[in-house]
């Protein structure tokens, strides 16, 4: 199966039309393109990415990678096409030797949507980088190309798309309404930046595959740019992930458009979605928490790559106000009330949030106290 997929890879000449060949560092790529030496151009582009400096990813440190037992299991299971899709459906389902991306063992839309988030891809990347075992990279390339080939982006009827996106179970809905929902598109845009770093050095990551990756990645960005969700936390997720795409791949001609689009939406929506008391307008503790982390993630990605000034000081003030709101609605053990669509949360996860927030607000005494204090001490509410 791996050989079949490898043979199916093509050197996608159109990838070079998507790239700004005048971007610093791409001189050899441009020279090869000018001679129409596409194989040489693809190899030079891969050489460039394997040695690229100047772009920082705040979510991953290749020099200090770790993998949990759970992640290792997801990676190993994925080799047999048993995919971790949803914690609510365990043990995970097997999707067949010839992967069936439309397999729907339980008629829950979340199970169908979240299959297309490829949650096991990043653990496979970690397993590859830590072990050096090419089997993870070969299988990732296989699954990546298999997904591209079996999940084409085709025209969608808006009314059908809205029904499926709203959560109505539509057993007769075309696969595209699940595979290409905006939230899943944005999830792949974000996570594939880490996966790119994890797998780029692999032998299985060929010059031909790189061109396939670029064409597919650009398809995602172009689609999302024209099809953002109308409102709410989904729109925030999509905008933040568009920032990731634009910042991480500045070589793409549309990179600045993507980055600016995401940042503009976040700057607009933080005023629209957050009340004066710091509460996010969907009034759900975990949506509120997600919104905080969305705003913070976009800021971190911009900050470590030279775009911090595209977020005004009011943006940071609002984020801090949101953190204070969240601290005040949580219980002394750092769990939160379970109203609306919220989950309980747990101490370790919430402590990690305060650690990340403290990195953005190092001079904030009360965030420091909430991060370093005993969880049972309820005297620290702000």
Where are these regions (language model features)?
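Extracellular glycan-targeting catalytic surfaces
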Residues: 2-230, 236-243
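Conserved adenylation A10 loop of the ANL superfamily
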Residues: 120, 372, 376
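Surface-exposed helix-capping loop/turn segments at secondary-structure junctions
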Residues: 130-134, 153-160, 276, 302-309, ...
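Extended, well-ordered alpha-helical scaffold segments
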Residues: 134-150, 201-227, 253-269, 307-329, ...
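Alpha-helix N-cap/helix-initiation motif
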Residues: 177, 231, 280-284
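The feature captures the catalytic groove of carbohydrate-active enzymes
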Residues: 205-209, 236-237, 247-248, 253-306
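Carbohydrate-active enzyme catalytic cores, enriched for enzymes
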Residues: 279-373, 381
């Amino acid at each position: 199966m791996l050989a079949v997929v490898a043979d199916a890879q093509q050197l996608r000449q159109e990838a070079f039309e998507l790239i700004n060949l005048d971007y610093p560092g791409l001189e050899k790529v441009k020279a090869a393109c000018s001679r129409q030496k596409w194989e040489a151009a693809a190899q030079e582009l891969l050489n460039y990415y394997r040695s690229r400096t100047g772009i920082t990813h705040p979510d991953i440190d290749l020099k200090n990678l770790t993998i949990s037992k759970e992640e290792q299991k997801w990676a190993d299971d994925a080799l047999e096409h048993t995919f971790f899709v949803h914690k609510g459906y365990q043990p995970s389902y097997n999707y067949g030797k010839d992967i069936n991306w439309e397999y729907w063992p339980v008629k829950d839309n979340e199970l169908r949507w979240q299959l297309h988030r490829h949650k096991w891809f990043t653990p496979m990347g970690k397993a590859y980088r830590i072990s050096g075992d090419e089997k993870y990279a070969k299988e990732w390339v296989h699954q990546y190309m298999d997904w591209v080939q079996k999940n084409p982006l085709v025209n969608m009827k808006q009314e059908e798309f809205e029904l499926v996106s709203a959560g109505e179970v539509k057993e007769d809905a075309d696969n595209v309404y699940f595979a290409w929902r905006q939230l899943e598109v944005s999830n792949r845009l974000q996570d594939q930046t880490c996966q790119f770093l994890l797998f780029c050095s692999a032998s299985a990551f060929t010059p031909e595959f790189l061109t396939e990756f670029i064409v597919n990645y650009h398809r995602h960005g172009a689609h999302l740019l024209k099809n953002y969700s109308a409102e709410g936390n989904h729109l925030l997720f999509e905008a933040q992930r568009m920032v990731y795409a634009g910042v991480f791949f500045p070589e793409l001609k549309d990179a600045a458009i993507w980055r600016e689009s995401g940042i503009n939406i976040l700057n607009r929506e933080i005023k629209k979605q957050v009340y004066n008391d710091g509460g996010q307008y969907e009034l759900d503790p975990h949506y509120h928490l997600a919104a905080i982390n969305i705003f913070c993630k976009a800021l971190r990605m911009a900050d470590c790559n030279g775009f911090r000034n595209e977020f005004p000081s009011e943006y940071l003030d609002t984020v801090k106000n949101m953190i204070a709101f969240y601290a005040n609605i949580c219980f002394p053990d750092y769990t939160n009330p379970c109203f609306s669509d919220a989950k309980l949360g747990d101490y370790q996860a919430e402590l990690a949030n305060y650690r990340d927030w403290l990195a953005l607000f190092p001079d904030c005494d009360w965030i420091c106290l909430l991060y370093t204090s005993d969880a049972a001490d309820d005297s620290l509410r702000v």
